[in-house]
């Protein structure tokens, strides 16, 4: 009975003609294509980034050439105040969700005023760039009209122009100590923590006959700073190259060495004046992942307890293996008196040196890190070269922190050799 009832139903089915099947498939594909296209469109719109450069005047400031020096105390102080004003203005505005970043790029002193050149980044989910530019300009104009506080700004001097991503990156990369890419955490070199690409763009590898030998810091288009003892084996430029990036091999953006300038008072086998400059045959083309660190002013102070970061491809433990990828360590500057104590280095730390790490040990620079950078960010998150990895007793030992050449002590010497 059940079978006989089902048979007529089965027998009554009709197959669709091939043209109808093809038409149906094409219709489904068209709908899928439309959905995918809309998704791609809205995702692209959502991620649309706009870059701007501009300028405005700060009035009633006596002429001072120090405002032109990007590392001077005067320049950083005024830039910090203006950057805070911009952040407050945008974050309290109706486009705070579109706001990404704003920075003072340069200050140009004039008679009784300073022109501030600015750099801005925004996103706009609706891709209405002209409307966005007008709103940004309006917020900046209102900010400049509000002259509360010690500064007097001129709203009539405001200029704002949209620029390309390429030009925006070029502006930032030509300034010292800026990091387009950042990591939220720092760990140790001894023990291992890998740096991100572009996180430490001034870090370089000094190579002898193609093999990593020491670290170095890019301080100018053709100049790097390193340790003098890195040239005990050879200082013949023909045997030396410099490369950048996070991988120690293969070489990335390799450059040849024209000259090695070793401090005149350095003595082989001793630790004082362990400083050298590398001059390259050609200029380094700055980019997001390769550009220079800031040099501190000779008068700049980095007190004990200040947080610093050391980077390099040195051994992960004493006489241990060396990493393929760049390592980083977050450490602290140690009081010189504590470092000169009998249980530590017994008076061997000179005024031109500084100790950094922890008296408890463990986190430290190690073999192969020599010549590399010890850096510190200022309140504007601009990074300065505080020290040069020089010497220590093994790696990560209790009461034996790393010892670095104090860059401020050699600031005049560096300027005399490089013009920087």
Curated annotation (Swiss-Prot):
Disulfide bonds join 214-230, 339-355, 366-395. The keyword Glycoprotein applies. It is a single-pass type II membrane protein. The active site is at residues 229, 274, 370. Keywords: Cell membrane, Disulfide bond, Glycoprotein, Hydrolase, Membrane, Protease, Serine protease, Signal-anchor, Transmembrane, Transmembrane helix. It comes from Rattus norvegicus (Rat). Serine protease. GO terms for biological process: proteolysis. Belongs to the peptidase S1 family. PROSITE patterns: SEA, TRYPSIN_DOM, TRYPSIN_HIS, TRYPSIN_SER. It comes from the Eukaryota. The gene is Tmprss11bnl. This is Transmembrane protease serine 11B-like protein. Residues 41-420 are extracellular. Residues 1-19 are cytoplasmic. Pfam families: SEA (PF01390), Trypsin (PF00089). The chain crosses the membrane at residues 20-40. Glycans are attached at residues 111, 146, 239. GO terms for cellular component: extracellular region; plasma membrane. Residues 48-165 form the SEA domain. Residues 189-419 form the Peptidase S1 domain. The lineage of its organism: Eukaryota, Metazoa, Chordata, Craniata, Vertebrata. Inhibited by aprotinin, leupeptin, benzamidine, SERPINA1, SPINT1 and SPINT2. One of its GO terms (molecular function) is serine-type endopeptidase activity. Its EC number is 3.4.21.-.
